[in-house]
Structures are given as structure tokens and as C-alpha cells.
Amino acid sequence: MKILVVLPRFPYPLEKGDKLRAYHQIVELSKRHDIYLFCVSHMKVTPESIEALRPYCKDIRVLRLNKVMCAINIVRNWFSSKSLQMGYWNTSHSKRGYKAYEREVQPDVVYNQMVRTMPLVARSKYPKVMDFQDALSMNTERRMERSRGLWHYVLHYEFKMLRSSEYNAFSFFDALTIISEADSEAIPHKKNGEIKIVPNGVDFDFFRPDAVTVPKEHDIVFCGNMSYAPNVSAARYLVEKVMPLVWAKRPSTTLLLAGASPKHSIWRLGLEDRVTVSGWVDDIRTAYASSRLFVAPMLIGSGLQNKLLEAMAMQMPCVTTSLANIPLGATNGDQLFVGDDAETLAEHIVSLLDNTELSTRIADSGHRFVHENYSWSAAVKPLEELLNAVVSK
């Protein structure tokens, strides 16, 4: 089968969740199908990144976005009641480029990621499957609820436009996929139960307990792209609300915040002597391996948290919130600990750091859980079956 994959970002390096998902889906699908990759990108894609995908793609086409035209499109969408981010990714240049590439490839099926790319492919004559990835409108709504002033107004506008786009997707595509049941239920359509659940997986060969050997320099680690609003919110909440309660009982407890592109507000958290902000890490496994406990106090966002899958695969005891655990489906008190306020999170952290036997039990149980439920080969299987079914109609 000839699959044309359409992405809003080049899927390498793997510092963002959408890139990680797309990369591993491409790797798995390429074992049995021909992959043609079309990406729009507002950043220069390095030759090294292209080469990382080359073994899995018959052809790769990257269309560089003009930021000035993107900005003009955002303004245009504001005044025409359309999603701002969809305007950013869908300029006349990107639409012409996609149509030309589609004519060249003549695929059996088009598979695009996120509503951001919907305007590129919605009118294609070929069978089409779109991956919502997660409920982007729900993510935006959660951010809106915690914002103030002009930004609250902008997010409220974008929330309404994304809800409309998610609803309209049912009219344009032969099938739709999403990362979790919770995200599917948040899509505003009476047929949201027909969306195919395609979870993420974890690379067990890469993320394994003995993958790297480094000293345990930190007690706690939180990893993620530190320019992404849900991660920024979680990091600040951890340092400003949770850690003071932990330090009241364990004054010497140390915390590592690891991940690409930290915002200024994240760098400032490192002014506390017991908090280290690393920025980009060449091998994120070293951040996990250098710490005793993984904590992800997610307050906003949507979808399945890859960082939790990776930490559990590295056999780390984990603490998170219900928001992150509902898509994951782990058992509180067995495979990880869940807390939805600073006091409960702090109690779990102190218990795990003070009780080696408990920490080991949670780590071992979580490790078994991800191995039994989150391999990439199993995760991509329902997607492959869906693509085959759409082509066979």
C-alpha cells in the first residue's frame, strides 16, 4: 500500500509528542507499506533529521513555511472566524505544494496528523484518514481556564474554532483516529464513538532500565518540551506548590527539570539551589537514569503522556495527576501514584523517597504494565487495519 503521510512538523528530532508519535508510526508502517512523507515546517530541517527518516520513506518532501505569510494568514483567519493555528500551517504556498506532491505520488491513502493539516488534504480525491492525535480543543479549553486578560480572549476564540474544525472533520474524512478514549469522548460530535483509538507506544529497546549508567544525582525528575504550555504549567506547579511541602519534610530533596527550549519562567525556577534546569539533553535517558523518582503533575493538556511511558519503561516509580493517568489507564497505588492537589502529590513523593521497598514495588509493577500494554507494534496495528479497510472500500 502506498501511504502519503502529511505532518505539520518534521518528525525528528523527537522532542515533541506529535513528532514522536508520527516517527514511530512511520517506522512500523514502513515494514509492510511504502511511505511518502510530506511535511510543512516553519523551521529549517537539518540533513541529519532527513537521514533519520530516509530508511523508512520512499520519498520525503519538506515545504518550508514563510513566517511572514503565516502571520498574514493568522490575521486573515481571525477576521474570517477560522482557527489561528490552522491558518499558520495552511498558506496558499503550502496548499499548492501539497496538491502538486499528491499528484506526483498518487497514493492509495492519505494519512494526516492533527486538524492543523486538515485544510491541506480535506478535498483530496483519495481515501483519507486523519489522526486527531488528541482533543486539541480540550487542551485549549484547559489552557483558557487558567489564563487571564487578552490571552484568555484569544484562547477562547481558538477553542471555539477548534471545536468547529473537529466537528467538521467527520464530513471530510473516511476515518478518524485519536490517542485515547478520554480524548475521543471530548470530540464534539455524536459519532465520536466511531473514532478509532490508536494509542502511543514506547521503544523498549531504547528505554530500558540498563540503557545508561549514570550516578543518581537527583531525587526527582520531570521531563518534557519546556516551551509547551502544559509542561511549563506542570513544572511551575511542581516547584512553586508541591516542592515546598516536600522540602518541609525532606529539606535536601533535589529536582531536575529536563527538556528542550525552556521558557524564561522555567529557567527562573533554577534560581532555587535544589532545582536544576538542564535545557536540551542529548540523551533524555540520562535524565531519567540520574533520578530516583519521576513526577508529572499535569494540570492542563490532553492525550497520552509519552514521558510517563518512558519513565515506567526505565523502571522508575512515577507520580502523576488524574488528568495524565486517565488516558494511561494505570492503577493508582499499584503501578504508580496519583494525586490531584499539592498536598497529595507531596505525600506520595515523600513516601516513595523514604520507603525503598515501596518505591521498588511501584517501579516493578509500572514496568510490567507498560510492557504488557504499550509496545509500538501493538499500538500501530489498529491504525494499519484501519488504513487497509479504508483502501478496500
Walk through the language-model features, giving the residues of each.
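Conserved acidic donor-binding segment of nucleotide-sugar-dependent glycosyltransferases
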Residues: 336-343, 351-356
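Acidic donor-binding loop of glycosyltransferase active sites
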Residues: 174, 289-303, 314-317
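Short hydrophobic beta-strand element within catalytic cores of glycosyltransferases
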Residues: 307-310, 317-321
